[in-house]
Swiss-Prot record:
Name by which UniProt lists this protein: High affinity immunoglobulin epsilon receptor subunit gamma
Function: Adapter protein containing an immunoreceptor tyrosine-based activation motif (ITAM) that transduces activation signals from various immunoreceptors. As a component of the high-affinity immunoglobulin E (IgE) receptor, mediates allergic inflammatory signaling in mast cells. As a constitutive component of interleukin-3 receptor complex, selectively mediates interleukin 4/IL4 production by basophils priming T-cells toward effector T-helper 2 subset. Associates with pattern recognition receptors CLEC4D and CLEC4E to form a functional signaling complex in myeloid cells.
InterPro entries linked: CD3_zeta/IgE_Fc_rcpt_gamma (IPR021663), FCER1G (IPR042340), Phos_immunorcpt_sig_ITAM (IPR003110)
GO-annotated biological processes: antigen processing and presentation of exogenous peptide antigen via MHC class I; antigen processing and presentation of exogenous peptide antigen via MHC class II; cellular response to low-density lipoprotein particle stimulus; defense response to bacterium; Fc receptor mediated stimulatory signaling pathway; Fc-gamma receptor signaling pathway; immunoglobulin mediated immune response; innate immune response
Origin: domain of life: Eukaryota
Extracellular side: 19-23
Modified residues (Phosphotyrosine): 64, 75
Source organism: Bos taurus (Bovine)
GO CC, alphabetical: external side of plasma membrane; Fc-epsilon receptor I complex; Fc-gamma receptor III complex
Amino acid sequence: MIPAVVLLLLLLVEQAAALGEPQLCYILDAILFLYGIVLTLLYCRLKLQVRKAATASEKSDGIYTGLSTRTQETYETLKHEKPPQ
């Protein structure tokens, strides 16, 4: 039932307004094309920044190679003595 109604509406409707003015379509296509280029450039720039940050963090790991863990406990237990009575 629904596909028949849609087909009937498509046959009764006149030419679409967008098809009557191709210059408008060309302008919108150009805007979308430029938008896609800008987004692609921003995405590539972001990927390069992440890659540079990852290599920089790998190089700085050499600072911590000489450190060892502490042998003394951070918190020591207190020896509580009872007062003499």
